[in-house]
From Swiss-Prot:
Protein name listed in UniProt: Biotin synthase
Organism: Gluconacetobacter diazotrophicus (strain ATCC 49037 / DSM 5601 / CCUG 37298 / CIP 103539 / LMG 7603 / PAl5)
Quaternary structure and partners: Homodimer.
Radical SAM core domain span: 36-264
Function: Catalyzes the conversion of dethiobiotin (DTB) to biotin by the insertion of a sulfur atom into dethiobiotin via a radical-based mechanism.
């Protein structure tokens, strides 16, 4: 499987005539996956707000005081397990937990490890996103049984400095290396709609597809424009352009789960359907993604029923 994709190659894919691009993406998708299957995951914010980072898209940053998010303490383990049971009963096979930290403190990491162990005991796969990790922390999470660690690249290396100044691109790559070395599956993607150009979008997919090993899960987010954040006034993304990014991700990373993440609340059913045709085969289920709205579970169920698609047990 190729891990040497170039930006120019990805840009050429994205620029293909739409029918040709969709045909190629669907062909790649069918070679590895059941095209009628969608994986369901649930995401819970276990520690919200107060983050010292300055990510321009994120209302959880303490630097964006008008973002409308009040800082909270880390949730208790049993409260998290209650949410996990509800997610399992609603059909989720993977439970993802996110904490608004630059990096976790050791005592907080131990609490998260207890959460991981508890969720695993419910028969669910686990994923956490806690910010930057060192090698020791990654191995501790693996000891607890963690299946996946999410740490996104967000955008291209060139556009990155326009979005974040408190964490470097290399620091993100270093965390991903620690996660891989610990034997944890990688969940890594980015965000579309942050003022980037077409070349940046190709650069994001090329960066993901040229990692030493393709991420097992690739969440592609559509920017949720939150009042009070620097990107609140960003231009909306053409739905067809977004579908093109999904298709390019599927072609370049044929064995990865490509996940529709944040921004689905603003997508029409028709736009989501095109994303599924382009190779997206995973969604987040539930009314919120960390602090932003997500489609109601009933809307998702109705759409999947209309399309004759079914949900699956989590595997990537």
């Amino acid at each position: 499987m190729r891990t040497d994709w170039t930006r120019d190659e990805i840009a050429a894919l994205i620029a293909l005539p739409f029918p040709e691009l969709m045909f190629r993406a669907q062909s790649v998708h069918r070679a590895r996956f059941d095209p009628t299957e969608i994986q369901i995951s649930t995401l819970l914010s276990i520690k919200t707000g107060g983050c010292p980072e300055d990510c321009a898209y994120c209302p959880q940053s303490a630097k964006h005081e008008d973002g409308g998010v009040k800082a909270s303490r880390l949730m208790a383990v049993e409260a998290v397990l209650k949410e996990a049971r509800a997610a399992r009963d609603a059909g989720a096979a993977r439970f993802c937990m996110g904490a608004a930290w630059r990096s976790p403190k050791d005592h907080d990491l131990e609490t998260v490890c207890a959460m991981v162990e508890g969720v695993k005991s419910l028969g669910m796969e686990t994923c956490v996103t806690l910010g930057m990790l060192d090698d020791r922390q990654a191995h501790r999470l693996r000891e607890a049984g963690l299946d996946y660690y999410n740490h996104n690249l967000d955008t291209s290396p060139e556009h990155y400095g326009s979005i974040i100044s408190t964490r470097t691109y290399q620091e993100r790559l270093d965390t991903l290396a620690h996660v891989r070395d610990a034997g944890i599956n990688v969940c890594c993607g980015g965000i579309v709609g942050m003022g980037e150009n077409d070349d940046d979008r190709a650069g994001l997919i090329a960066s993901l597809a040229s990692l030493p090993r393709h991420p097992e899960s690739v969440p592609i987010n559509l920017l949720v424009r939150v009042a009070g954040t620097p990107l609140a006034g960003a231009d909306p993304v053409d739905p067809i352009d977004f579908v093109r990014i999904i298709a390019a991700a599927r072609i370049a990373m044929p064995a990865s789960r490509v996940r529709l993440a944040a921004g689905r609340e603003d997508m029409t059913d028709e736009a989501q359907t095109l994303c599924f045709l382009a190779g997206a085969n995973s969604i987040f289920y539930g009314e919120k993604l960390l602090t932003t709205p997500n489609p109601e579970a009933s809307r998702d169920a109705r759409l999947l029923a209309r399309l004759g698609m079914h949900t699956s047990l989590a595997q990537a």
